[in-house]
């Protein structure tokens, strides 16, 4: 028994010892784990330290908002919130408004300006009437400019309370300068104020909405007892000034680099593709877009989506155009041409001295113009460049802009004071003056002299003694100037309408009506009828006796006699009377025989030639009237003598 008990005790001891041997030892942490845990604790402590100022500021702001809401309630003894709409004692509802939009984007350190550099105006209005408040103490209130959160009151037509406005005012970050510096106060004058220089010192990326607004409120203590609703601008982003070097321009300028346009990054793929094709500026981009838009789209490739393309084109079209113009003349008629602006876009059509905008053309005219535009793009080297300031000042004329009164005034002035007309014409046309664009009227190479003098009304002498009809003068020129017509046939072939003289006819004392349109029959096309004068009837002419009397008065004037003496001395080579023609006067050789390749660009000399021929024609007509009058007087005297002999 004793042995068995000992055995059991020994077995139990072995089992107990064995259990102790089988139990695993406690796992010791690795050295790396200890390091990681230590770093985590340290990082957490640093995070808490960095979050503490932020948490303190948030708590402080929330407490300020809560106290601001509780303050008015305690003063008024009401626990409800303030009403949304508050009117003054006189029933007016006063509101501040920004009348100018900001120039975006804004950068830190940059001046806050209106669109295109304009100043920013604010106004105080009465919302009930929509009119500005120009009287009363509120019209000269002092205002404070503050920065608001971008998500404050996105609805433009929604009112807000003063507490709501104050709760969204943004303060500067801890340790930073004031968020908005400069002239943060403005005083109204008759209800209108102008913002001074304002500068942001910090970007808007650190607030929840990542955008700012400018707010405007009445300074505390001003206009007490009167509610004036605050003003706010649209939400905008303020970027760091380091990105200003790469900012886009709104609107872009013609000479801006092409990467200033939306969707084209500097030194990006699109930028490199455009520069490889010689498209370096915004003006180059617009010109290619107007002339061949599919080509430009192909250059940019499939990497630019349709949405990006639309945004790019829309931004480019906001570019401000210059006054430069380009004109392409039709091959068959040198007084008809199409006008392009500086980006090669069709602006209108010129015919004679008239300008027609592209919007005013009829369907048939548009078909003709489209053909000219296509030819102009194919032969751009033939397009002539002009300064478009004179064209921009034009008033678009009616269908008939050259009146008979203008032609009469010119003819009268040319006969009464020919030297003044020629001297004035020469001095008023500089050597580089274009024959197409004058100070007032725009005409082509077929422009008549009367039309050109129409652009210089100060040169025309309106003499009431000589308001005879131009049709009579033209008839006389056609009847008695056949020799001049033969001499100037070369210039007539060059489409100089001022020299379109009819064939030589017999010298008769009668005057017959001539249809003015027949004179220009060789040069007519379907566009030139816009500027042709109407026909004149026989009843519109002066009588022969009245014409004779008035021409006699003109020729007997002192100015005309001095003019004739001058030409008598200068003509014929030596001024001898033996060299005078039958009319008693000679003319100096001002007109040289034109060569076969007459240069159409010699606008000034061409106009001078036309001027001298007009004067010579008018004078020859006067000489003919005097000669015929003398012959008639001689015939009357002879008949009287015969009657006396018969008696």
UniProtKB/Swiss-Prot annotation:
**Motif extent (Nuclear localization signal):** 12-19
Annotated region Disordered: the residues are 1-26
Q: Which family does it belong to?
A: Belongs to the plant ACBP60 protein family.
- Span list, region Calmodulin-binding: 8-85
Q: What does this protein do?
A: Transcription activator that binds DNA in a sequence-specific manner, likely 5'-GAAATTTTGG-3', to promote the expression of target genes.
The record's subcellular location field reads:
Nucleus
Keywords for this protein: Activator, Calmodulin-binding, DNA-binding, Nucleus, Transcription, Transcription regulation
Disulfide bond as UniProt keyword: no
Q: What is this protein called?
A: Calmodulin-binding protein 60 B
Q: Which PANTHER family match?
A: CALMODULIN-BINDING PROTEIN 60 B, OS02G0177800 PROTEIN
Question: Where does the record place the region DNA-binding?
Answer: 155-278
């Amino acid at each position: 028994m004793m042995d068995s008990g000992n055995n059991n005790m020994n077995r139990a001891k072995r089992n107990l010892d064995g259990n102790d041997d089988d139990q695993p030892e406690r796992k010791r942490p690795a050295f790396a784990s200890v390091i990681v845990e230590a770093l985590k604790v340290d990082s957490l402590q640093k995070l808490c330290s960095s979050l503490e100022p932020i948490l303190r500021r948030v708590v402080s702001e929330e407490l300020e908002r809560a106290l601001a809401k509780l303050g008015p309630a305690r003063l008024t003894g009401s626990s409800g919130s303030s009403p949304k709409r508050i009117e003054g004692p006189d029933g007016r509802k006063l509101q501040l408004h920004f009348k100018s939009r900001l120039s975006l984007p804004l950068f830190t350190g940059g001046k806050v300006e209106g669109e295109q550099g304009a100043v920013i105006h604010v106004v105080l209005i009465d919302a009930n009437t929509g009119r500005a408040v120009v009287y009363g103490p509120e019209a000269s209130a002092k205002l404070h400019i503050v920065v608001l959160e971008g998500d404050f009151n996105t609805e433009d037509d929604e009112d807000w309370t003063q507490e709501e406005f104050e709760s969204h005012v943004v303060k500067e970050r801890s340790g930073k300068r004031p968020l908005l510096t400069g002239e943060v106060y403005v005083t109204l004058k008759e209800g209108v104020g102008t913002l001074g220089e304002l500068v942001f010192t910090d970007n808007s990326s650190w607030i929840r909405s990542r955008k700012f607004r400018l707010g405007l409120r009445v300074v505390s203590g001003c206009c007490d007892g009167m509610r004036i609703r605050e003003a706010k601008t649209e939400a905008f982003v303020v970027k760091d000034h380091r990105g200003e070097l790469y900012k886009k321009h709104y609107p872009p300028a013609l000479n801006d680099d092409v990467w200033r346009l939306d969707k084209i990054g500097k030194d990006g793929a699109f930028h490199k593709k455009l520069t490889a094709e010689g498209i370096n500026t915004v003006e180059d981009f617009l010109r290619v877009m107007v002339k061949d838009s599919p080509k430009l789209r192909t250059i940019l490739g499939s990497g630019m989506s349709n949405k990006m393309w639309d945004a790019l084109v829309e931004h480019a079209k906001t570019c401000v155009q210059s006054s430069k113009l380009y004109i392409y003349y039709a091959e068959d008629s040198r007084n008809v041409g199409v006008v392009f602006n500086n980006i090669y876009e069709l602006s209108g059509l010129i015919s004679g001295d008239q300008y027609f905008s592209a919007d005013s053309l009829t369907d048939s005219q548009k078909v003709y113009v489209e053909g000219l535009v296509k030819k102009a793009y194919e032969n751009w080297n033939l397009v002539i460049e002009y300064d478009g300031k004179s064209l921009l000042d034009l008033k678009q004329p009616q269908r008939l802009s050259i009146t008979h009164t203008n032609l009469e005034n010119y003819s009268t002035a040319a006969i009464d004071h020919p030297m003044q007309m020629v001297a004035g014409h020469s001095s008023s046309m500089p050597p580089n003056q274009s024959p197409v664009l004058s100070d007032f009227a725009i005409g082509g190479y077929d422009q008549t002299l009367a039309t050109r003098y129409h652009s210089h009304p100060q040169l025309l002498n309106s003499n009431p003694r000589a308001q005879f009809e131009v049709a009579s003068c033209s008839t006389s020129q056609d009847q008695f100037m056949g020799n001049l017509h033969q001499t100037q046939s070369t210039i007539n072939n060059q489409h100089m309408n001022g020299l379109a003289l009819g064939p030589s006819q017999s010298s008769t004392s009668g005057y017959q009506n001539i249809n003015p349109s027949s004179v220009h029959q060789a040069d007519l096309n379907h566009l030139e009828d816009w500027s042709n004068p109407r026909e004149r009837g026989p009843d519109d002419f002066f009588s022969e006796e009245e014409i004779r009397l008035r021409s006699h008065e003109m020729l007997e004037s002192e100015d005309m006699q001095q003019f004739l003496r001058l030409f008598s001395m200068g003509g014929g080579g030596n001024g001898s009377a033996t060299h005078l023609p039958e009319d008693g006067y000679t003319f100096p050789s001002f007109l040289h025989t034109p060569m076969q390749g007459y240069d159409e660009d010699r606008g000034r000399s061409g106009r001078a030639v036309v001027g001298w021929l007009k004067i010579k024609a008018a004078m020859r007509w006067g000489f003919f009237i005097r000669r015929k009058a003398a012959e008639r007087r001689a015939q009357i005297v002879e008949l009287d003598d015969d009657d006396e002999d018969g008696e």
